[in-house]
Amino acid sequence: MIVIDSSAFSKFLVREEGWEKVVPCLDPSVEPRAVDILIVEVSNVIWKYMEKYKLIKEEQALKLYEQMMRLIKEEIMVIEPSVKYLRDALKIAMGYSITVYDSLFLAQAKALNAKLVTSDRRQKEIAEDIGIPVEYIP
């Protein structure tokens, strides 16, 4: 079982450099999971690519959103409610001075005894410090 955070999933979805390394993490046999905040965070990345960076058009943005939702609806990646991990996430956030958004993925990985897949260096460092196996995809 693995937990994919928003940074790694966004890399895959918008095809940032190194996105291919995320593909094996979406194989149903490794039981990929994430917390529901991933949907909001990745939707925001899509918006930024369109609105702020002007790298995609509205039609492309909506297609990326639909691709993400298809992966979730087809249960390629299991999405769990954030509230399930919120207390532990808050503890991690306070202990490491990071956002609760980021710490939710750490709390989920820890609770599930799962490997965390991330493209966030700070997330990687905290995971290692907490004892969570981590795959860093820069």
Where are these regions (language model features)?
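Active-site-proximal, substrate-binding regions of enzyme catalytic domains
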Residues: 43-82, 86-88
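Alpha-helix capping/helix-boundary segments
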Residues: 8-9, 38-39, 85, 105, ...
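Short, well-structured N-terminal submotif of metal-dependent ribonuclease cores
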Residues: 1-37, 52-62
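Acidic, PIN/NYN-like endoribonuclease modules and their adjacent C-terminal/linker elements
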Residues: 1, 35, 79, 106-138
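Residues that scaffold the ATP/ADP-binding catalytic core of kinase and kinase-like folds
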Residues: 11-13, 45, 126
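Phosphate- and divalent-cation-binding pockets in alpha/beta enzyme and binding domains
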Residues: 21, 41, 88, 125-126
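Active-site neighborhoods of divalent-metal-dependent phosphate/nucleic-acid chemistry enzymes
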Residues: 74-115, 119
